[in-house]
C-alpha cells in the first residue's frame, strides 16, 4: 500500500485477513444526497422543489378566466455564513424566488384566447440550507433531521393471527396504502364475507365498491367465479366435467366413464387416482341426479322468453321448483357457480347476499353516508366524493414507489403506471385476497425491509413545502376569482407566510428534527445516520409490538443489529450499517461481490432486500485460494432469508466485508466477535457519550475505521487539494496548491481557518489544532488539523490506561473503578466545558431595563470584575453568585413613607425605583470568562463595550482578509516573477523591482506579455475583491441585530469550566464495561510490577465472566503488547545515536510483517531515514494496531506480539501491594485498555437542599436539580421506616420535612430559640384529599377532639 507523507507519520498495524474490495462509502451521504435532490433543479420534475411546484401549479380560478402558472425557481445566496448564524442565533437559509406567469383569458372570444400575460419573480419564503456536514442551523443551534423508516406505499396482505374472533379463526385483510390519500382496506369477517373500509371507518360489504365502479351483479360473479355448465334432460342433468374439480369431494352418486363402467362408487371419497382415471378415459360429460344441483347458485339471470319474468336471478340458490320452472320455460342449459369448501370459497357470493345496494347510485350513496354521516346525500355530491377518494390526482397519489410495489405484488408486469387507482387495480386486490383465503398465496411480512422504506430529509422537506403550497393555493384561487385582475401582479396574489410557516415548523419542531448530539465526532456521525421508525406517519412507542422492534433477516448489511437504544425505544431507532445506502425508491441496499462458477470477482453490485431473496449469498469469511476460488465443499450461505449450506457452484454473490452487517459505532469496538451482543450494544452506545479530553490520545487497539470516521465527521480539517504547507499558526493553515490541480486563472492558494474554543450543543469544547508543519507536502484528503477527540486524524475518544484486573479492598465492588492519582495529575481525563449564559434587557411596561454597572445595594467588591458598561471582563475567573452582567429593572411606584422621601431627597431618584436583576454565575459553577458578545437592537444606542467588541471584530476581519489578500497576492507575484525569469530578466533585476512594478513590465514575447497582463488583471480583481469582502464584513458587524419583539439588548457570556476527574464520575471501556470511580488512590498505594511501574486503574475481574464481554481481556493483552513494542522502540531510539537506524528499521519491519495472511503491506525499506525516525518517534508511546470486527487478531498473533515486546505470553505479571510491598499471591492480568470518560459527571448531578421552593397544591418540595428540589421519600421508603418501627422519624418525614406548612415554619423559630422540639401538624396532602372527596359531592369533615 502507498502511504502519503502525512500518513507515514503513524501507521496502524492492521491484522485484517480479508482484502478490502470496497472502501466504506462517505458516511454522511444519506443526508447530503437527499437534501441535494431537494434543492437541485430537476428537469424531469419528479422530485424536490420542482416536483412540489409542478404538483400544485397551474392554479386556475373557479371561473376558468385566469390562471397562475409556474415557470421556474431559484435559490438565492444566504445572508450570513454558518458561523455567523450560530453566533447571531439565526437560521442559515436562502431566499426562494419563483418566477410565476399570470395568464388572463378573454371571456368574449373563443375558449383559450389569451388576453394578457404577466410574468414576475415572487419571493416565497426562506429555505433552510444544509451545512457541509449534513446539519441545519436553526435559530443558531445545529440540528439534524433523522431519516424515517416507514411502511412503503403499495398493497399489503396480512391476517390477524386469530386474535379478533373468539373462535381463533384467522381473518385475512388487504390494505392499499398510498403515499398520500385515503387508505382502502378489505377484510374478511368470521362468516367469510368480504368487507371494505375507507380510512378505517365503519365497514361496508366489499361488493358496494364494485357496484360504485359500475359493475353489475352478473359482471361481479363472472370476475370472481368459474362456472359449471349443466344440460337439463327430463329427469337427469348432464354436467360438463372438469375432473380436477372433483378432487377431495365425496361422490353422492356412482361416477361412470363413457362406457358406463363405474369408476367411483357412491359414498366414496374421490382421490387423485380416480381423477387420473377420468382423465385417461377422456370423460367430458357426466350424468348426475337432479338433487345434485340443489343448493348450488345460479351464475346468471334466467328469464322466461315469453313473459320476460325472471325465473332464477343470478347468485340465487337453485331449488327443485326452480328447475321445474326452467324446464317448463324450455330452457335447456343452466350455469352454476363453481364453489367448494376447500379452495374455491363462496366469499363474493355470500357478500352479494348481504349487500343492500343493487345499482351504482345506491352504492355511491351508501359510501357517502359512511364517509359523511348525517349529511343529506345528493347524486353529484356522492359521485364527487367517491371520485376524489381514489381517482383524483390532487387528493390521491400512490407515488412511483407505491405503484412499483403495487404492480409487483399483484404480478402486473410493468413497474410504471398511474398514481391513482383504476377499476382493475381494485378488482386485482380483491382477487388476490380471495386467492390467499383459498390457500394459494402467502400473506406479506410487514417487517421485511422490502416493505419498509427510508424517508430522508429531502423528501420530508418537500412534503412540508407542498403542504405550505397547498395552503397558498386556496388563497390564490379565491383572489383570482375576486376583484379586477388587470391591475394585479403575481406578487399581489401570493402570500409567502403559509409556506415559511410550514417549513419553519418542520425544521424547528418536528419530532424528527433533533438537537444534534455533539458530544464527540462519533455521536455526530451516528446521529446523522440514525433511522427512526417513530415520528409523523410512523409508529408510536406504545403501539409498537415486539415483532417491529426485533432484528429481521433482511437487516443484514442494511441496519445494524447491535446499535439501538436501551429502554422504550429499543428496536424503533436503528443505525445504518457501514456500507448501506438507499436506492432511488428509498429502499435500503447493501453491496455484494459477484461470484461466477465458484470464483469470486471484483464486481460489486448493490442489492435491495427484495432482490436479495432471489439469490444465494455467501459470507465474507469463507476460505478462498489465491485465484479467488472457493475451497470448501459446503459453504454457509443465505437464501430467501434462511441460513443454509450449498455447493460453491450454486453461490451467486458474497459479502464485501465482515463489517458489512454492523454500524460505524459497533465497528469501532475491537474484538467485537468475542463480546456478548447486549454488552456490545452498551459499548456502541457509550462511545457516543465520551467527552473530548484535554489531550486526545489515539487508541492503541483500534479497528482501522478510526481515520475514516474522523475525516467524514468533518471535525478535522482535511486538505481539499494537494500541495505544500506554506504557513501554519493556531488559527489558520495556508497550502500552496500543486500546479496540476489548479484551475486556469486561479490563485494557487488554499486557506483553512480553524475553529477555536467554541461551544458544542452538549457544552463540550470544540477546538481545532494544526498537526502539520511548514514545508510538508500534502495530498488531497490529508488531515491538516485535529478537532475535538481526534489525534493525528484518528478518532480518539478516550485514553489508553494501564489496567490490572484484581480486587482492591472492596473499592472495585460492583463495577466501581479505582484510579491512580497520577491520572488526575497528568490531566489524562480533564475536560473543558463551555457554558453560555445570556442576559436579556427588555422593554417593560414600567420602562426599559438597563445594562449598567450602577446596581443598587451591591458592594464594590461584587462589581470588581465588571467594566464601566456593567459587563464582565474576558479572562476574569468567576465563581457561583458572582455578577456577570449588571442589569436593573424599573420597579412599580409604591406609596413612599416619610423616611423614604427623606432618603430620596438626599440621595436622588435612582436608588429606589429600580431593582437588581443582574445575571449571576449559577451556584455550583466556577470558571473563566472566554468570550462576551453584545447584541443591540436596531435604533438602540450601543454601549461602550459593544462598540469595543465591534471594533475588535472589524480589526480582526481586516487582519484576516489582509493576510488572505497578502498570501494570494504573493501567489500572483511569484508566478509573475517566474514569468519574468523565463522571459530573460535576471534575479537581481526582479529583486530590485518594487512589488507594484512587477506586473507592469514589458516583455518582447507576446504570449508571455498576455500572460503577465492576465496576472495583472487577476491582481486588480483580488484588490477589488478584498475591498468588497471587507465592506460586506464591516456592514455585517456594525448593523443592528434582529432581536425578538420587546428585546433591546442581549449579552451572551461564555464561561469555560475545567473539570478534572473525581469520584462519582462515570467511566467505561468500549465493551459495555462501565463503572463509577470510587476512589482516587495515591500513586504509592497502587499495585506495581517488578520494574516498579504502578498501574493506573484497577478493575474488578468479576465484571467479566457473567457479562461475557471477553473482548476487553483480549484488548488488554494486545494493548500490553502494543505498548511494550513502543517501549522497545523508545529504548532503541536512545541507542541509535551510536548504532544508527538499522536495528530500529529491522524491528519495525518485523512488527509490521507479523501475523498470518495479514493483508496490510508496509514497505519499511522504502522509508527515508527522516521518515523512519519520525515514524519511530510517533510509535514510542505504543504501536497502534487495528483488529477489525469479525476479522481481527487471533490468539496466536497476540502471543507473537507479546513475545516481540518481550512480555510473558500469559499476559500476566507479578504485582506488589503498594502499601505493604508484599507480592500478591498470584500473577495478575495487566495491560492497556482504552477508557472513556462519559458525559455523566458528578458535578452536574451532585445536589443538596435544606429548604426551597414548594409545589403550589400539595405544598411538597419540588423534585430535581433544575428546580432546586428535594429527595422523594416514596412509599417503599415509608415501608422501610415502618419495618424498623421508627415512628418519630417517619412522622417528621411526612410532616415538617414535607408538607406541614405551619410545622415547618415553626421549626425555624424553634431552632433559633435553641428548642429542638417539633410540633407536627396536619400535612397539606391530607387537606388535598379532603377537597378531592368533597369535589365528588361527599361532605367529609375532620373531627378534631
Curated annotation (Swiss-Prot):
It holds the Pfam family RNA_pol_Rpb2_2. GO terms for biological process: DNA-templated transcription. GO terms for molecular function: DNA binding; DNA-directed RNA polymerase activity; ribonucleoside binding. InterPro entries: DNA-dir_RNA_pol_bsu_ext_1_sf (IPR042107), DNA-dir_RNA_pol_bsu_external_1 (IPR019462), DNA-dir_RNA_pol_su2 (IPR015712), DNA-dir_RNAP_su2_dom (IPR007120), DNA-dir_RNAP_su2_hyb_sf (IPR037033), RNA_pol_bsu_bac (IPR010243), RNA_pol_bsu_CS (IPR007121), RNA_pol_bsu_protrusion (IPR007644). It is an enzyme of class 2 (transferase). The RNAP catalytic core consists of 2 alpha, 1 beta, 1 beta' and 1 omega subunit. When a sigma factor is associated with the core the holoenzyme is formed, which can initiate transcription. This is DNA-directed RNA polymerase subunit beta. It comes from Shewanella sp. (strain MR-4).
Amino acid at each position: 500500500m502507498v502511504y502519503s507523507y502525512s500518513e507515514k507519520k503513524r501507521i496502524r498495524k492492521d491484522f485484517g485477513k480479508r482484502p478490502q474490495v470496497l472502501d466504506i462509502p462517505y458516511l454522511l451521504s444519506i443526508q447530503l444526497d437527499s437534501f441535494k435532490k431537494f434543492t437541485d433543479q430537476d428537469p424531469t420534475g419528479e422530485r424536490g422543489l420542482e416536483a412540489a411546484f409542478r404538483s400544485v401549479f397551474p392554479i386556475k380560478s373557479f371561473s376558468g378566466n385566469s390562471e397562475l402558472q409556474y415557470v421556474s425557481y431559484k435559490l438565492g445566496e444566504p445572508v450570513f455564513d454558518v458561523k455567523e448564524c450560530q453566533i447571531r442565533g439565526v437560521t442559515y437559509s436562502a431566499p426562494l424566488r419563483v418566477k410565476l406567469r399570470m395568464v388572463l383569458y378573454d371571456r368574449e372570444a373563443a375558449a383559450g384566447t389569451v388576453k394578457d400575460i404577466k410574468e414576475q419573480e415572487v419571493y416565497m419564503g426562506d429555505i433552510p440550507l444544509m451545512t457541509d456536514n449534513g446539519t441545519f442551523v436553526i435559530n443558531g443551534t445545529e440540528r439534524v433531521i433523522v431519516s424515517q423508516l416507514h411502511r412503503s406505499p403499495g398493497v399489503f396482505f396480512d391476517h390477524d393471527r386469530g386474535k379478533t374472533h373468539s373462535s381463533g379463526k384467522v381473518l385475512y385483510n388487504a390494505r392499499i396504502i398510498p403515499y398520500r390519500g385515503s387508505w382502502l382496506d378489505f377484510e374478511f369477517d368470521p362468516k367469510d364475507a368480504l368487507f371494505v373500509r375507507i380510512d378505517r371507518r365503519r365497514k361496508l360489504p366489499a361488493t358496494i365498491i364494485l357496484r360504485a365502479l359500475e359493475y353489475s351483479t352478473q359482471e361481479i360473479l363472472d370476475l370472481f367465479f368459474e362456472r359449471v355448465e349443466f344440460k337439463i334432460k327430463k329427469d337427469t342433468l348432464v354436467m360438463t366435467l372438469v375432473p380436477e374439480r372433483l378432487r377431495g369431494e365425496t361422490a353422492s352418486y356412482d361416477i361412470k366413464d363413457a362406457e358406463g363402467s363405474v369408476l367411483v362408487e357412491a359414498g366414496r371419497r374421490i382421490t387423485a387416482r380416480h381423477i387420473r382415471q377420468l382423465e385417461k378415459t377422456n370423460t367430458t360429460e357426466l350424468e348426475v341426479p337432479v338433487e345434485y344441483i340443489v343448493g348450488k347458485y345460479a351464475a346468471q339471470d334466467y328469464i322466461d322468453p315469453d313473459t320476460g319474468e325472471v325465473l332464477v336471478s343470478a347468485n340465487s340458490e337453485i331449488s327443485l321448483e326452480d328447475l321445474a320452472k326452467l324446464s317448463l320455460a324450455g330452457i335447456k342449459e343452466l350455469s352454476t357457480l363453481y364453489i367448494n369448501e376447500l379452495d374455491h370459497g363462496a366469499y363474493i357470493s355470500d357478500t352479494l347476499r348481504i349487500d343492500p345496494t343493487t345499482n351504482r347510485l345506491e352504492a355511491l350513496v351508501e359510501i357517502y353516508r359512511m364517509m359523511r354521516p348525517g349529511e343529506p346525500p345528493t347524486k353529484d355530491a356522492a359521485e364527487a366524493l367517491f371520485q376524489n377518494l381514489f381517482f383524483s390526482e390532487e387528493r390521491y397519489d400512490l407515488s412511483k414507489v407505491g405503484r412499483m410495489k403495487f404492480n409487483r405484488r399483484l404480478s402486473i408486469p410493468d413497474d410504471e403506471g398511474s398514481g391513482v387507482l383504476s377499476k382493475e387495480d381494485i378488482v386485482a386486490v380483491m382477487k388476490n385476497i380471495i386467492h390467499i383465503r383459498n390457500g394459494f398465496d402467502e400473506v406479506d411480512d410487514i417487517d421485511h425491509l422490502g416493505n419498509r422504506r427510508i424517508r430522508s430529509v429531502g423528501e420530508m422537506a418537500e412534503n412540508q413545502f407542498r403542504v405550505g403550497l397547498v395552503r397558498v393555493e386556496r388563497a390564490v384561487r379565491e383572489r383570482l376569482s375576486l376583484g379586477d385582475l388587470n391591475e394585479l401582479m403575481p406578487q399581489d396574489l401570493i402570500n409567502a407566510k403559509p409556506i415559511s410557516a410550514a417549513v419553519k415548523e418542520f425544521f424547528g419542531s418536528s419530532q424528527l428534527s433533533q438537537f444534534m448530539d455533539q458530544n464527540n465526532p462519533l455521536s455526530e456521525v451516528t446521529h446523522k445516520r440514525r433511522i427512526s421508525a417513530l415520528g409523523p406517519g410512523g409508529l408510536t412507542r406504545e403501539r409498537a409490538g415486539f415483532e417491529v422492534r426485533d432484528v429481521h433477516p433482511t437487516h443484514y448489511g442494511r441496519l445494524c443489529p447491535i446499535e439501538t437504544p436501551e429502554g422504550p425505544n429499543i428496536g424503533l431507532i436503528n443505525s445504518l450499517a457501514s456500507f448501506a445506502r438507499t436506492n432511488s425508491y428509498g429502499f435500503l441496499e447493501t453491496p455484494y461481490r459477484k461470484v461466477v462458477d465458484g470464483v469470486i470477482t471484483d464486481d460489486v453490485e448493490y442489492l435491495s432486500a427484495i432482490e436479495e431473496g432471489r439469490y444465494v449469498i455467501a459470507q465474507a469469511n469463507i476460505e478462498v485460494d489465491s485465484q479467488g476460488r472457493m475451497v470448501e465443499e459446503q459453504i454457509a450461505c443465505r437464501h430467501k432469508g434462511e441460513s443454509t449450506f450449498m455447493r460453491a457452484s450454486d453461490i451467486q454473490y458474497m459479502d464485501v466485508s465482515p463489517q458489512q452487517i454492523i454500524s460505524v459505532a459497533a465497528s469501532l469496538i475491537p474484538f467485537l466477535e468475542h463480546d456478548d451482543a447486549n454488552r456490545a450494544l452498551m459499548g456502541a452506545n457509550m462511545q457516543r457519550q465520551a467527552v473530548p479530553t484535554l489531550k486526545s490520545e489515539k487508541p492503541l487497539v483500534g479497528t482501522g475505521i478510526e481515520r475514516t470516521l474522523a475525516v467524514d465527521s468533518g471535525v478535522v480539517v482535511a486538505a481539499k487539494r494537494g500541495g505544500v504547507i506554506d504557513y501554519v499558526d493556531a488559527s489558520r493553515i495556508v497550502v500552496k496548491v500543486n500546479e496540476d490541480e489548479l484551475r486556469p486563472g486561479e490563485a494557487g492558494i488554499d486557506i483553512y481557518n480553524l475553529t477555536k474554543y467554541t461551544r458544542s450543543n452538549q457544552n463540550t469544547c470544540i477546538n481545532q489544532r494544526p498537526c502539520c508543519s511548514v514545508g510538508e507536502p500534502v495530498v488531497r484528503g490529508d488531515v491538516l488539523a485535529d478537532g475535538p477527540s481526534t489525534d493525528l486524524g484518528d478518532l480518539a475518544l478516550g485514553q489508553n490506561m494501564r489496567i490490572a484486573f484484581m480486587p482492591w479492598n472492596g473499592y472495585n465492588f460492583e463495577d466501581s473503578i479505582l484510579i491512580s492519582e497520577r491520572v488526575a495529575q497528568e490531566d489524562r481525563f480533564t475536560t473543558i466545558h463551555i457554558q453560555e449564559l445570556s442576559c436579556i434587557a427588555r422593554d417593560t411596561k414600567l420602562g426599559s431595563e438597563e445594562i449598567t454597572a450602577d446596581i443598587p445595594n451591591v458592594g464594590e467588591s461584587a462589581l470588581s470584575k465588571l467594566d464601566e458598561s456593567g459587563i464582565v471582563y474576558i479572562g476574569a475567573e468567576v465563581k457561583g453568585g458572582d455578577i456577570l452582567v449588571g442589569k436593573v429593572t424599573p420597579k412599580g411606584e409604591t406609596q413612599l413613607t416619610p423616611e423614604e422621601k427623606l432618603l430620596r431627597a438626599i440621595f436622588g431618584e435612582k436608588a429606589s425605583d429600580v431593582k437588581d436583576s443582574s445575571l449571576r454565575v449559577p451556584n455550583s459553577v466556577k470558571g473563566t470568562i472566554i468570550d462576551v458578545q453584545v447584541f443591540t437592537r436596531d435604533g438602540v444606542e450601543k454601549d461602550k463595550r459593544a462598540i469595543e467588541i465591534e471594533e475588535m471584530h472589524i480589526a480582526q476581519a481586516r487582519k484576516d482578509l489582509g493576510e488572505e489578500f497578502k498570501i494570494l497576492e504573493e501567489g500572483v507575484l511569484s508566478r509573475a516573477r517566474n514569468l519574468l525569469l523565463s522571459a530573460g530578466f535576471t534575479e537581481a533585476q526582479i529583486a530590485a523591482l518594487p512589488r507594484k512594478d512587477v506586473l507592469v513590465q514589458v516583455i518582447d514575447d507576446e504570449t508571455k506579455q498576455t500572460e503577465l497582463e492576465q496576472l495583472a488583471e487577476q491582481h486588480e480583481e483580488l484588490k477589488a475583491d478584498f475591498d468588497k469582502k471587507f465592506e460586506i464584513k464591516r456592514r455585517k458587524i456594525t448593523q443592528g441585530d434582529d432581536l425578538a419583539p420587546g428585546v433591546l439588548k442581549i449579552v451572551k457570556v461564555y464561561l469555560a469550566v475545567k473539570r478534572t476527574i473525581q469520584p462519582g464520575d462515570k467511566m467505561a471501556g468500549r465493551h459495555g464495561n462501565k463503572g463509577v470511580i470510587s476512589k482516587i488512590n495515591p500513586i504509592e498505594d497502587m499495585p506495581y510490577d517488578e520494574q516498579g511501574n504502578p498501574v493506573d486503574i484497577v478493575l474488578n475481574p468479576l465484571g467479566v465472566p457473567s457479562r461475557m464481554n471477553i473482548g476487553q481481556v483480549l484488548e488488554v493483552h494486545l494493548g500490553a503488547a502494543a505498548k511494550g513494542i513502543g517501549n522497545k522502540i523508545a529504548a532503541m531510539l536512545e541507542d541509535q545515536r551510536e548504532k544508527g537506524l538499522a536495528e530500529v528499521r529491522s524491528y519495525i519491519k518485523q512488527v509490521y510483517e507479523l501475523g498470518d495472511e495479514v493483508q496490510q503491506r508496509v514497505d519499511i525499506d522504502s522509508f527515508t531515514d527522516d521518515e523512519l525516525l519520525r515514524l519511530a518517534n510517533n510509535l514510542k508511546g505504543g504501536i497502534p494496531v487495528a483488529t477489525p470486527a469479525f476479522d481481527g487478531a487471533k490468539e496466536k498473533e497476540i502471543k507473537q506480539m507479546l513475545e516481540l515486546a518481550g512480555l510473558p505470553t500469559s499476559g500476566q505479571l507479578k504485582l506488589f501491594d503498594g502499601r505493604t510491598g508484599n507480592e500478591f499471591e498470584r500473577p495478575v492480568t495487566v495491560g492497556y485498555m482504552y477508557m472513556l470518560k462519559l458525559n455523566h459527571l458528578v458535578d452536574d448531578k451532585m445536589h443538596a437542599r435544606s429548604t426551597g421552593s414548594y409545589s403550589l397544591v400539595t405544598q411538597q418540595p419540588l423534585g430535581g436539580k433544575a428546580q432546586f428540589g428535594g429527595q422523594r421519600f416514596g412509599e417503599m421508603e415509608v415501608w422501610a421506616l415502618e419495618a424498623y418501627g421508627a415512628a418519630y422519624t417517619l412522622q417528621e418525614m411526612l410532616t415538617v420535612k414535607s408538607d406541614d406548612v405551619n410545622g415547618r415554619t415553626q421549626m425555624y423559630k424553634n431552632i433559633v430559640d435553641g428548642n429542638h422540639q417539633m410540633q407536627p401538624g396536619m400535612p397539606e396532602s391530607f387537606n388535598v384529599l379532603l377537597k378531592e372527596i368533597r369535589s365528588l359531592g361527599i361532605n367529609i369533615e375532620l373531627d378534631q377532639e
